[in-house]
């Protein structure tokens, strides 16, 4: 069964005005097509903030420049961020997500959807539920080590509605791995 729709996962455009408007348009379109189900988008809160500073995976300017410079230097993309997480450990994303600028760069996008999809944002749940009394949170990506902690929070707070844990998979790859800009 379809329980909700998602407009994307780890799309860093949601840190920009253009991306927030796109998120709103996609949500409205899905509501017109099916008004019975909520809409979410999985946002990696910390990476969304980095994107707002020009360090994100995608941007119009970066795409144009990458096309020109593809042979000059390695692109910073999904592969880079996965390697960074491997070096720094899982906690850096969760802790980074608690920074005030991360809230500033996600609040407008979250306001355009029915369910806020938090990728690795478990350390924000309690704070954000107080700050945004109408927000419903979905753990759209969570580390295995946080599964029990998540369940305990969800038992206490009905606005935390579910969780997707990266546990094991038949890896088909990140959306960008293997694209023309990678090695």
Q: What feature does the model see in each segment?
A:
Residues 1-183:
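Extended substrate-binding grooves/exosites of carbohydrate-active enzymes
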């Amino acid at each position: 069964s379809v329980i909700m729709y998602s407009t994307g996962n780890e799309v860093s455009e949601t840190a920009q005005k253009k991306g927030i408007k796109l998120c709103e348009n996609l949500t409205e379109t899905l509501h017109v097509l099916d008004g019975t189900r909520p809409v979410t988008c999985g946002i990696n809160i910390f990476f969304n903030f980095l994107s707002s500073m020009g360090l994100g995976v995608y941007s119009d300017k970066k795409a144009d420049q990458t096309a020109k410079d593809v042979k000059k230097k390695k692109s910073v993309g999904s592969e880079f961020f996965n390697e960074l997480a491997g070096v720094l450990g899982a906690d850096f994303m969760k802790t980074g997500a608690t920074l005030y600028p991360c809230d500033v760069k996600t609040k407008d996008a979250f306001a355009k959807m029915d369910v806020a999809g938090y990728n690795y944002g478990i350390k924000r749940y309690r704070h954000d539920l107080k700050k945004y009394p109408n927000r419903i949170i979905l753990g759209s990506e969570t580390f295995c080590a946080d599964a029990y902690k998540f369940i305990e929070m969800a038992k206490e707070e009905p606005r935390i509605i579910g969780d997707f844990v990266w546990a094991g998979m038949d890896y088909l790859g990140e959306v960008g791995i293997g694209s023309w800009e990678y090695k």
